[in-house]
Amino acid sequence: MLSFARLARYLGEDQPLYGLQPQGMDGNQPHHTRVEDMAAHYIKEMRTLQPHGPYYLGGHCAGSWVAFEMAQQLQAAGEEVQLLVLVDSEPPNIAPPQVPRLKHLAQRAMFYWQDKRLWHAIAWKIQLIYQNLLLLRVGGDEAQRVATIRQAHAQAHRDYRSGQFYGDVTFIRSRESTHLPDKAWHLRWSELISGELHTKIADCTHAGLVLEPGAGELAAAIGAAIEEAQAQ
């Protein structure tokens, strides 16, 4: 959640931003292994602060799927979701076979090559894998919990099959993600919602969305979406 501190500052004091922490971080409760259970848990936590809608929801990367599932569960419970913002996430239900997956990796490699960051990206990925293995083997209790939760959440997202959301969605993409087939992403997300998919492009990398200067651009896009939703 600390990665969203910059975003919160850019949104300003008059626009609170609440982050929700995965269950199991304290070691006293089991971690979730299904996106549906994560969403139900977050809704329960959210309702301690705001029992009823209208709700303004958002998620970044893998968190977008959880926010999308939360929106569906809230609607099923008769609550209003005034705004749903999804940030730089491919749509669920794709479950690509191995060949398209290799094509996807090749497209990403080409982007980093053109952006002159290919070797940096490869080194970062290797370092991330190494750190996760290190956390599991020799890390302290808290570090091992984090690594275990990461693995559980990765499996949960692989297994997730989404339902339908009834309403509009604001979709914010990084410049990095636009090397992927825009039409495919747009069409697939559009199939999962009944309203309009409003897409905005932020001129930064995926990770840069919550860093400087990308966080400012992301906050501006979210702020504009909030104002539009409130005006309806």
Where are these regions (language model features)?
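A hydrolase-biased, glycine/serine/histidine/acidic-enriched motif that marks catalytic-domain neighborhoods
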Residues: 1-232
